[in-house]
């Protein structure tokens, strides 16, 4: 398997930051109450991941090992500030909805973890690919979890899409069920914990079924030769 395919497999499935590494749970649980919020935070995290991986890879040979972590954090904080300003300018409603969780991207273990474990040891192109696929893996889990919680909690899908994509996106809103009252358990953090648990369980079931289909290799039987004195 090529290095690029390995990065895709690791980011999207085998080493998914949300379902396998269980990193970034704070924003994952708090913000994924709707697809719009989940997608907005996921895109912001993806952009910061790619930017930080590229930046760290570029300076990896010029930063002393003793101060590399503070330098990495400064790079990540600068990129998060840029993303925050862009969101404030072009998606102000979503910016208000996400609130403190945008600047908290700085402390997201996924970003500093990939910077330290991968970007600081690899060239720019592989580092950018790693950041993209890890970010896309995180975003996909956010969106799936957000869709589950929004459908169960409010009976809608893509509610508030205009906050992210503009006024035209209000037509994307789908009313799946009609509830007199919202199902708060799905919209609050306990519902997010339950949803993440279901997604992790589903992934484990799929992995176990895939392993069971693979042909089992029988271990060769090694016979010991007994040597006796003549």
Curated annotation (Swiss-Prot):
The complex is composed of six subunits: RnfA, RnfB, RnfC, RnfD, RnfE and RnfG. It comes from the Bacteria. Pfam families: Rnf-Nqr (PF02508). GO terms for cellular component: plasma membrane. The keyword Electron transport applies. Keywords: Cell inner membrane, Cell membrane, Electron transport, Membrane, Translocase, Transmembrane, Transmembrane helix, Transport. InterPro entries: NqrDE/RnfAE, RnfE. It is found in: Cell inner membrane. Its EC number is 7.-.-.-. Its main location: membrane. It is an enzyme of class 7 (translocase). PANTHER family: ELECTRON TRANSPORT COMPLEX PROTEIN RNFE, ION-TRANSLOCATING OXIDOREDUCTASE COMPLEX SUBUNIT E. Belongs to the NqrDE/RnfAE family. The keyword Lyase does not apply. This is Ion-translocating oxidoreductase complex subunit E. GO terms for biological process: electron transport chain. Part of a membrane-bound complex that couples electron transfer with translocation of ions across the membrane. Signal peptide: none annotated. The chain crosses the membrane at residues 11-31, 39-59, 69-89, 93-113, 132-152, 182-202. It comes from Vibrio atlanticus (strain LGP32) (Vibrio splendidus (strain Mel32)). It is a multi-pass membrane protein.
């Amino acid at each position: 398997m090529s290095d690029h395919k390995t990065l895709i497999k690791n980011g999207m499935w085998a080493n998914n930051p949300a379902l396998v590494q269980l990193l970034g749970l704070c924003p994952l649980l708090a913000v994924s109450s709707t697809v719009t919020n989940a997608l907005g935070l996921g895109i912001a995290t993806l952009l910061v991941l790619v930017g930080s991986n590229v930046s760290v890879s570029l300076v990896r040979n010029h930063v002393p090992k003793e101060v590399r972590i503070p330098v990495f954090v400064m790079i990540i904080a600068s990129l998060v500030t840029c993303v925050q300003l862009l969101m404030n300018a072009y998606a102000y409603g979503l910016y208000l909805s996400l609130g403190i969780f945008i600047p908290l991207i700085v402390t997201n273990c996924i970003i500093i973890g990939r910077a330290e474990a991968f970007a600081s040891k690899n060239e720019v192109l592989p580092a950018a690919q790693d950041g993209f696929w890890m970010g896309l893996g995180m975003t996909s889990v956010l969106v799936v979890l957000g869709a589950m919680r929004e459908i169960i909690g409010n009976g809608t899908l893509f509610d508030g899409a205009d906050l992210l994509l503009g006024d035209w996106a209000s037509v994307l809103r789908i009313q799946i069920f009609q509830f007199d009252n919202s199902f708060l358990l799905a919209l609050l953090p306990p519902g997010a914990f339950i949803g993440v648990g279901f997604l992790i369980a589903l992934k484990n079931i799929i992995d176990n079924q895939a392993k069971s289909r693979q042909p089992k290799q029988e271990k060769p039987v090694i016979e010991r030769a007994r040597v006796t004195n003549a």
